[in-house]
Amino acid sequence: MADYQGKNVVIIGLGLTGLSCVDFFLARGVTPRVMDTRMTPPGLDKLPEAVERHTGGLNDEWLMAADLIVASPGIALAHPSLSAAADAGIEIVGDIELFCREAQAPIVAITGSNGKSTVTTLVGEMAKAAGVNVGVGGNIGLPALMLLDDECELYVLELSSFQLETTSSLQAVAATILNVTEDHMDRYPFGLQQYRAAKLRIYENAKVCVVNADDALTMPIRGADERCVSFGVNMGDYHLNHQQGETWLRVKGEKVLNVKEMKLSGQHNYTNALAALALADAAGLPRASSLKALTTFTGLPHRFEVVLEHNGVRWVNDSKATNVGSTEAALNGLHVDGTLHLLLGGDGKSADFSPLARYLNGDNVRLYCFGRDGAQLAALRPEVAEQTETMEQAMRLLATRVQPGDMVLLSPACASLDQFKNFEQRGNEFARLAKELG
């Protein structure tokens, strides 16, 4: 456990995570200063009066006088103010680093471009099924510092690449990178390898590394070593087995669960289940209770969630598909009897959309593209694409065309922030319109 007594601590970024950092230091007798680039950040009204605050920008004078800066994942380390502080030798960490210095129980750590929330939640459910007192959070749900508890027997953390950049004390009992596809390229000007390098930090000091046999970018930089366990579609220690029209989860040659016993569906969810099982095994959770959790877990909202089935039409909310790889995962192996009406659009975060093209070739595909990067997405296959300003306009247009056997799929391949508060609001709006129009 670290000692922060007498340290001049500055926290950048408020919200729930920022407040958890403030509470963390106050509980240790240290009163931090807080700054946020927003004029009225969420949580400002909850700051104790004793805590000095600066809003509407960064305060370089405070930063350069600090002994320790706790930076929100929302601010790039390349920001000139943070670069100057780093050059001056000032320590810069994030909330996950503070957590790792304090946590007394083993940590299962999960990152990846797609699927990480599902896998994190699943491993948490596996632990609960085994009767283990587990804390689940990080990049989803509760901030990590709010999970700290002497009674906790296991922590399961979802970690973003931004969080990993400021973390050096993580020693996970099991860690995984589920996949690496282009995302947040606006924060990684040197491209995919720079983004991957941030993700790879999760393996440092990990006891077991769970890698994706189908994605070489998830391997440690020097290749697989004795710490590595793999999962994949057709290969890996944990893989899918297809026999007589049925699909099984298989571990090291042994069939352990028929996927028809699972509530989750789709190949991407079956591989998520394999990854979760590998992590649970590595953390020492009993296999039987982990498999039981797989049969009861229904999935998370906004992740290939069927929100309406009416008149033979399925309306599917995959609003969490905020990048190309996530939409690829939704389209890969997708079977639709009639026409697929695919809603794409939003803020593409400087991504390359071309990998989607191979999934859009069928005669039964229609594209409805909206938002900031709608034109770029419509250009993937202009002859079957319609472009509108908003998602609502697109949905009202397609609603006049759907037939029994069709699927309406919101899997936008983009962030939502150009037109929505977050992906949840976008997904809720889709669900509301589906119920109105379907």
From Swiss-Prot:
Its main location: cytoplasm. Its EC number is 6.3.2.9. Keywords: ATP-binding, Cell cycle, Cell division, Cell shape, Cell wall biogenesis/degradation, Cytoplasm, Ligase, Nucleotide-binding, Peptidoglycan synthesis. It is found in: Cytoplasm. InterPro entries: Mur-like_cat_sf, Mur_ligase_C, Mur_ligase_C_dom_sf, Mur_ligase_cen, MurD. It catalyses: UDP-N-acetyl-alpha-D-muramoyl-L-alanine + D-glutamate + ATP = UDP-N-acetyl-alpha-D-muramoyl-L-alanyl-D-glutamate + ADP + phosphate + H(+). The keyword RNA-binding does not apply. It is an enzyme of class 6 (ligase). GO terms for biological process: cell division; cell wall organization; peptidoglycan biosynthetic process; regulation of cell shape. ATP binds at G112, S113, N114, G115, K116, S117, T118. Coiled coil: none annotated. GO terms for molecular function: ATP binding; UDP-N-acetylmuramoylalanine-D-glutamate ligase activity. The keyword Nucleotide-binding applies. Pathway: Cell wall biogenesis; peptidoglycan biosynthesis. One of its GO terms (cellular component) is cytoplasm. Belongs to the MurCDEF family. PANTHER family: UDP-N-ACETYLMURAMOYLALANINE--D-GLUTAMATE LIGASE. Cell wall formation. Catalyzes the addition of glutamate to the nucleotide precursor UDP-N-acetylmuramoyl-L-alanine (UMA). This is UDP-N-acetylmuramoylalanine--D-glutamate ligase. It comes from Escherichia coli O6:H1 (strain CFT073 / ATCC 700928 / UPEC). The gene is murD.
